[in-house]
Amino acid sequence: VQENPALTWVFFVYTKTRYGSSFDPAKRTKTLTERGLDFADAGHVFAGFHFTRADDRRVYGERRYVTAGLLRGRLIVLVWTPRGTARRIISMRHANDREKALFEKNLG
């Protein structure tokens, strides 16, 4: 696994916050249909071991973050932005092999 030194992950363990989640209902339905993942379950990812980094791949007009964490024993990647007292979920997908290896390496 090659690591990108410009890519910085912050490790969180069982984050306890007052943040809830919000999302676009149509996008939630599409992700549930196409990937079998429900945006409504994002809180479970944040409640467990997870890594979060700023998503600075481009200028989005808002702060975005990428979080990798476990959901029902599988590694999930979320893209989200803070909106008031909620995390607005933008996307949710299963991690690829490179992300899985990086996650396991950082846990070990």
Question: Model features per residue range: what roles?
Answer:
Residues 1-108:
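Ribonuclease/tRNase effector modules and their secretory precursors
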